[in-house]
């Protein structure tokens, strides 16, 4: 069965938690393991934070967009912004690279996303924004309920 949802929300850091919980709630219908659920929540958090901090420079009057598609046991998540874009995607995906070195704990977002997801594609153009496409195949083992 295929199911999908879309969200759009203001580019404020408080909405990162909302995005994480919304996607996690949506994917629970596939009965992911706790590890899978945690990984999905983490990648959503990282990608949304990248959009807010790097794409929009913490300016709150913009939108972050999420699309989530469930097909059988596969999850497809797209997180998109219309911000400043990424000049060099390969460089941005290098561990510890950040365009904001003054921020604590910067530079691991794409590395974390790539480690938790099966595939990650980043499409970006300067001054046009960035889209991060991610997929993950869930394990076939399901939760046992008492």
UniProtKB/Swiss-Prot annotation:
GO terms for biological process: asexual sporulation; negative regulation of sporulation resulting in formation of a cellular spore; sporulation resulting in formation of a cellular spore. Keywords: ATP-binding, Kinase, Nucleotide-binding, Serine/threonine-protein kinase, Sporulation, Transferase. Its EC number is 2.7.11.1. Pfam families: HATPase_c_2. Signal peptide: none annotated. NCBIfam families: spIIAB (TIGR01925). Belongs to the anti-sigma-factor family. This is Anti-sigma F factor.
């Amino acid at each position: 069965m295929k199911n999908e949802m879309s969200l759009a929300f203001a580019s404020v850091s408080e909405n990162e938690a909302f995005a994480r919980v919304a996607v996690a709630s949506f994917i629970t219908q596939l009965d992911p393991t706790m590890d899978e659920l945690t990984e999905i929540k983490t990648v959503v958090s990282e990608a949304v934070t990248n959009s807010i901090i790097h794409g929009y420079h913490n300016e709150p009057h913009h939108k972050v967009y999420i699309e989530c598609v469930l097909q059988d046991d596969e999850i497809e998540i797209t997180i998109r912004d219309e911000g400043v874009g990424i000049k060099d995607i390969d460089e941005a995906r290098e561990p510890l690279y950040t365009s904001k070195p003054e921020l604590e704990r910067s530079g691991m977002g794409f590395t974390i996303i790539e480690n938790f997801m099966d595939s990650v594609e980043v499409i970006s153009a300067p001054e046009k924004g960035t889209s991060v496409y991610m997929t993950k195949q869930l394990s076939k083992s399901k939760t046992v309920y008492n």
